[in-house]
UniProtKB/Swiss-Prot annotation:
Taxonomic lineage of the native organism: Bacteria, Bacillati, Actinomycetota, Actinomycetes, Micrococcales
Organism: Kocuria rhizophila (strain ATCC 9341 / DSM 348 / NBRC 103217 / DC2201)
Swiss-Prot/TrEMBL keywords: ATP-binding, Ligase, Magnesium, Metal-binding, Nucleotide-binding, Tricarboxylic acid cycle
Positions of ATP binding: K45, G52, R53, G54, A94, E99
Pathway as given in its UniProt record: Carbohydrate metabolism; tricarboxylic acid cycle; succinate from succinyl-CoA (ligase route): step 1/1
Protein name: Succinate--CoA ligase [ADP-forming] subunit beta
InterPro entries on file: ATP-grasp, ATP-grasp_succ-CoA_synth-type, ATP_grasp_subdomain_1, Succ-CoA_synthase_bsu_CS, SUCC_ACL_C, Succ_CoA_ligase-like_bsu, Succinyl-CoA_synth-like
Domain ATP-grasp: 9-236
NCBIfam families (alphabetical): PRK00696.1, sucCoAbeta
């Protein structure tokens, strides 16, 4: 989960990272009140999860609360690279003497963390990495140890900070490492990390991405989710512990196991080429459990997508036998009742496949069509979706 800047700032403050005052506002009136509370020069910053805010006019320096009101009025509702601005952060102005860059992220290839640091901050890090790779220090960090004081010292030495500044930056990097480790983040980035005219080190603009797989350790992270941009179907699936990703097609997909579901997406896309170019509408993995409740929750999510014209249930029975899956499908349709209106193609194979197919035949539900193979099921689902377009 990617956080907004104001949320990252709050996490930094929670862990002792030095930050400036910042208050989020959703109206010009709130922005003015925030500027009055902070006092002095403030910065009105669009809160969107995308870069390039400044160039798009989403960051303005306000000398008075009245200016903060005017700028908030301009920025709220603005479209920045496809993201609508619903809130701004009113941040205390800073006397910036120097700008630096720091980030720590997950390095999957090396099974470690990677810290990156530069004395040249404020610009796009991708641009710096290409144009002047020598200006960007890269230091491996052990997940077992994290960013210790010794590791932070190694980072600042490789980044070529002067001795005086290095001593001030080191404790800040340790605290940022603490944010990364204790919040189960996959990215913590500060650009810029600044030195003020008084020599103080501040995290001025932060980005944080949290690992959703660690959400069970952080129930408080649920409050950070952005309900204004979340897909309602994905939210419903998450509430039911379903692995669901919405796509842009017309054939709803339900399968057990990520590998099988991915293969099903490919087969449906291939079949759709000869049926009006229909495509998969989603990824939905029900995992090892195919109870009536789980199947009903999955079908409820998929059938709630108006783009879906047909559904393909592709299950290979293993620990969960095919007869249990078939019973789940039949009971799920009973639970959904009149809300289930779209044709469902079911392909079962594996443990107790004959019993499962028999259950579906005996149910004789008007929405259910069975298929013996994945290819045949995908072809039928694509055909039905095309006919309903």
């Amino acid at each position: 989960m990617d956080l907004f800047e104001y949320q990252a700032r709050d996490l930094f403050e929670k862990h002792g990272v030095p930050v400036l005052a910042g208050i989020v506002a959703t109206t010009p009136e709130e922005a003015k009140a925030a500027a009055e509370k902070i006092g002095g020069v403030t910065v009105v910053k669009a809160q969107v999860k995308v870069g390039g805010r400044g160039k798009a006019g989403g960051v303005k320096v306000a000398k008075t609360p009245e200016e903060a009101y005017e700028y908030a009025q301009q920025i709220l509702g603005m479209d920045i690279k496809g993201h609508t601005v619903h809130r701004v952060m009113i941040a205390q102005g800073a006397d910036i003497a120097e700008e630096y860059y720091f980030s720590v992220l997950l390095d999957r290839a090396n099974r470690s963390y990677l810290a990156m640091c530069s004395v040249e901050g404020g610009m796009e890090i991708e641009q710096l990495a290409v144009e002047r790779p020598d200006a960007l220090a890269r230091v491996d960090v052990s997940p077992a140890d994290g960013i210790t004081e010794a590791k932070a010292r190694e980072i600042v030495e490789q980044a070529k900070f002067d001795a005086e500044t290095a001593e001030k930056v080191i404790p800040v990097l340790v605290k940022l490492g603490e944010v990364y480790a204790k919040e189960d983040a996959t990215l913590v980035e500060v650009n810029p990390l600044v030195k003020t005219g008084d020599g103080e080190i501040l995290a001025l603009d932060g980005k944080v991405s949290l690992d959703d797989n660690a959400a069970f350790r952080h129930p408080e992270h649920a409050e950070l989710a952005d309900k204004t941009t979340a897909d309602p179907l994905e939210e419903k699936a998450k509430e039911n512990d379903l692995n669901y990703v919405k796509l842009d097609g017309e054939v709803g997909i339900i399968g057990n196991g990520a590998g099988l579901v991915m293969s099903t997406l490919d087969v449906v896309a291939y079949a759709g080429e000869k049926h009006g170019d229909v495509k998969p509408a989603n990824f939905l993995d029900i995992g090892g459990g195919a109870s009536a409740e789980v199947m009903a929750a999955g079908l409820d999510v998929i059938l709630g997508d108006p783009q879906v014209k047909s559904v393909f249930v592709n299950v290979f029975g293993g620990i969960t036998a095919c007869d249990a899956v078939a019973n789940g499908i039949v009971k799920a349709l009973e639970i959904l009742g009149d809300s289930a209106t779209k044709p469902i193609v079911v392909r079962l194979d594996g443990n107790n496949v004959d019993e499962g197919r028999a259950i579906l035949r005996e149910a004789n539900h008007p929405l259910i069509t069975t298929a013996d193979t994945m290819d045949a099921g995908a072809d039928k689902a694509a055909e039905l979706a095309h006919a309903a377009k």
